[in-house]
Amino acid sequence: MVDPKQEAITAGLRGAFWDADRPVPDDVKLSVHPLRTHDGATISGFFYARGDEKVAAVVMHPREHLVPFYLPAELTRQGIAVCLPTPRLIGNDIRLEHELAILDVAAAVSFLRVQGFEKILLVGNSGGGPLFAFYNQQALLAPEKRLTRTPAGKQVPLAEAEMIPPDGIVFVSAHLGQGRLLMNGVDPSVVDEQDPMSSDPALDPFSTANGFSGKGATYAPEFVARYRAAQIERVRRLDSHALEIVARRVAARKRIKEGGATPADRMEAAYTPIFPVWRTDADLRCWDLSIDPSDRKLGSLWGANPAVSNLGSIGFGRLCTADSWLSTWSGLSSNASMEKCAPAIEQPTLFIEYTGDASTFPEDTQAIFDWLGTSDKQRMKVAGDHHGRPIHEGDPNPRPLVGQRIGEWVAERFSEQSNSTLKEASHAD
């Protein structure tokens, strides 16, 4: 049984491993397969299967390694084979571009199709949700209508790639997208990006003068409105900085192509500066629980010490290049957002939310569900934190319930013939 006191932090995979009493079943075998993406990268596909399944799922995050994650254990208990592709850039924000990450997804889906599965699902958890929504959006387009460039202008070969649409999509604690997640969390009181200690007192979310308290903040509606507008402006400034970097690089490369370039031009053409983005854990909803109330506890995915999460070396979007910022972490420029991509979904979709999630709040989950373009969509609310752990000590473990609901939904949505093993596995469990 998971212990709600064991982990106070849920960012990344903290607290997300499968439960000791609910591992992958003994008759499910693990094999590892090299998967070659269309653009030539090689990723690893960790594949859990009994061997007689007709339905398989891809479970992936754009930068996390999910092999010990709880969802594969629960899905295999429901008779669903699972492919867990490792992203090409594990734990790396510096080069993460979602337009390339969806080629990793494509390689995993193609692998499952070659294996002969009749139905293929995408099961997107947390940041895997918007990643899969983005993949699906592009996969459903005619190849010539797919994106040809990243937000930074880099060419991407989506038109030539095999991008097989899934038969169904499941979202579990999916958020709005990494860019929107960060835009809701950036501290807009930062005055100078080169000085992480700089601050505008009138926008400081951790000032008692503005309503903060370590035991629970109370922010005035007027402050909240100014704060949110200033968050967008900070992201816009960071976008401008990133685009200036890209423009200098592009101009230098143009001079090289035209001939007569100087040594300085060649250095400028190769220069890819890495810049920190400080103070990215300041979503007011994490500290004032009266704003869009839910079952969440005080604090963010990173815990309840904002000094550590905002000024420590680890945090969302902490180190970026212009390319990764614009593609992944910008709430204004990233293509991988639920708002942009969910309307394209036409397949059956199951949307599962945890009521104590500190990354996605009731207004967010309602918006995501409303954006889903399919008319065949179902929603389930489960008491749990971001990674499906009990909110309070002594509460039941919600993870088996989530796995069971996914199994039931798959059995309802797909044929009896395809899902005979699903029902047998579910009943045996």
Model-derived regions: residue spans:
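N-terminal cap/lid segment of alpha/beta-hydrolase-fold proteins
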Residues: V2-E53, I391-H392, P396-R399
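Catalytic active-site module of serine/aspartate enzymes centered on a nucleophile-bearing elbow/loop
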Residues: A383-D429
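Conserved alpha/beta-hydrolase "acid-adjacent" motif
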Residues: L181, A358-D364
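Conserved alpha/beta-hydrolase
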Residues: P72-D93
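Catalytic nucleophile-loop/oxyanion-hole region of alpha/beta-hydrolase
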Residues: R88-L121, D395-P400
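Alpha/beta-hydrolase
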Residues: A202-K340
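Primarily recognizes the serine-hydrolase "nucleophile elbow" in alpha/beta-hydrolase
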Residues: K119-Q194
